[in-house]
């Protein structure tokens, strides 16, 4: 084996970032951390820097950077501390970097992930919002700059593993030429799968974040509870695998053992199974096309005993319907959907908005802004900003 591969972890203090560093720590001969980034959790970032000794640590603002640098110097750590958006893009596209874990949550991850793509990196994509907001621009940049895109979302990673030869070139060729009839995108149904609909107005952030199977951050936990997460994943799948929404079917699978399936034109259905632990798709993408140990326990099928499937109830999960409508509409609709959802989820977590009001706010924002075709990154960002502003105005009146 040659030199260790150099990696930048964008969003190192989040759930995916922490899991990524866990896998990396098991293979010091294969991977070397070049940079770690965080939004504001400088204490955890300091701990990670002490363990992994990256060349750079990047945090959002100067105040946090000062606190981080003070702590690192006190501990004798020589990691250089940077801050701000330009620094994020710099460590994502640096010539010394071989791969980038793109795990910043939400729209904030768009620019640094795009910087990694434009630098031709191997990009491990955990930020689905990048493709939801700017799928056309992003996939075009991947092709133009020779970047390699590997999915980290457990469902999309499962789909990738079930496709022929595991080739990361479906952005160009699509699925039909590979004999694929459709993708079966599985969803647990979240913590409110069986909750009476009339009770959803009273659920709390704590209940929404208590996912029955997965350990995740707050934002994605709420998205899972509303099934917006599955809606965003539907849009992501269309861009990642160059396919139409008609070829993607969402299936409720409460056990979260089958992470997704691919049906072929000959009637074969291939599925990827495993314990619900994000270290599996992370390890797969890190080492692809090889395999490495992830720290995840073996799946015990005897203990699993049964696997259940059902169709999603769009009356219970209107966010899924909104996402399905947005991907069919195209244009600025997915941008508006994502931006309004981020505002709505933040308000719910702050107890300023009821859980059942999340889809209402999103729908109101999408109705308030005319359809357009944002053909540049600047227009995408403008549409995102407009949707956030409208959402905040509506929220203030509710």
Curated annotation (Swiss-Prot):
It catalyses: 2-C-methyl-D-erythritol 4-phosphate + NADP(+) = 1-deoxy-D-xylulose 5-phosphate + NADPH + H(+). Belongs to the DXR family. Pathway: Isoprenoid biosynthesis; isopentenyl diphosphate biosynthesis via DXP pathway; isopentenyl diphosphate from 1-deoxy-D-xylulose 5-phosphate: step 1/6. GO terms for biological process: isopentenyl diphosphate biosynthetic process, methylerythritol 4-phosphate pathway involved in terpenoid biosynthetic process. One of its GO terms (molecular function) is NADPH binding. Its cofactor is Mg(2+); Mn(2+). This is 1-deoxy-D-xylulose 5-phosphate reductoisomerase. It comes from the Bacteria. InterPro entries: DXP_reductoisomerase, DXP_reductoisomerase_C, DXP_reductoisomerase_N, DXPR_C, DXPR_C_sf, NAD(P)-bd_dom_sf. It holds the Pfam family DXP_redisom_C. Catalyzes the NADPH-dependent rearrangement and reduction of 1-deoxy-D-xylulose-5-phosphate (DXP) to 2-C-methyl-D-erythritol 4-phosphate (MEP). The gene is dxr.
